[in-house]
């Protein structure tokens, strides 16, 4: 499921509800007993605990081998799939770039084998090649994905359904995908007294 909406509409709050960090002011959230949630946040400070490890060690620290798309993937193979050369995979975490830290976050999450994966702006700080590798990995993810992103291509590639948060506490299904949401935004901009220049593309997610 892809989640879109302007900044401040409540996208991150929805993710926090799903992972149990906040409670709803009305209604309730029901979670299955077998649900295992993992979240790719926009914060990389969680990697400070493994700063002294090498990248491949930080991945293997979660699991040595996982099954993805029906195939076994080792920690070393996971780093290669996410664009780390053998040399970079043996670089200490404290020495890698911001984009590499994001990739490491995702690899550690996937090695924990969740069945629900929440992604909050997962493409931040990633180059084109890494984006392609990440999309391939997410395509093979067997569980449920909930993705908040400004990247329209990513949403259309890795999610089957999109919904819009309208900023007033309501949620609308988008059978027409992200394009339907953009049309809604354009209609709102035209209908507003100020004209809202540039509003059509603001906060695609």
Ranges and model annotations:
Residues 1-205:
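ABC ATP-binding cassette signature C-motif
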């Amino acid at each position: 499921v892809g989640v879109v909406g302007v900044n401040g509409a409540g996208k991150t709050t929805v993710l926090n509800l799903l992972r149990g960090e906040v409670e709803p002011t009305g209604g309730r959230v029901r979670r299955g007993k077998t649900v295992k949630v993992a979240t790719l946040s926009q914060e990389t400070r969680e990697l400070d605990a493994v700063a002294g490890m090498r990248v491949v060690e930080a991945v293997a620290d979660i699991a040595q081998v996982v099954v993805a798309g029906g195939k076994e993937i080792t920690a070393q193979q996971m780093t290669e799939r996410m664009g780390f050369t053998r040399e970079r995979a043996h670089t200490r975490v404290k020495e890698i770039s911001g984009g590499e830290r994001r990739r490491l976050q995702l690899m550690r999450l996937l090695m924990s084998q969740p069945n629900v994966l929440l992604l909050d702006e997962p493409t931040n700080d990633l180059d084109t090649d890494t984006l392609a590798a990440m999309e391939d990995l997410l395509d093979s993810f067997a569980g449920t994905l909930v993705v908040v992103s400004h990247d329209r291509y990513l949403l259309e590639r890795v999610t089957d359904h999109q919904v819009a948060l309208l900023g007033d506490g309501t949620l609308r299904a988008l059978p027409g995908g992200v394009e339907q949401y953009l049309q809604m935004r354009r209609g709102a901009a035209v209908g507003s007294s100020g004209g809202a220049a540039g509003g059509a593309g603001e906060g695609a997610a």
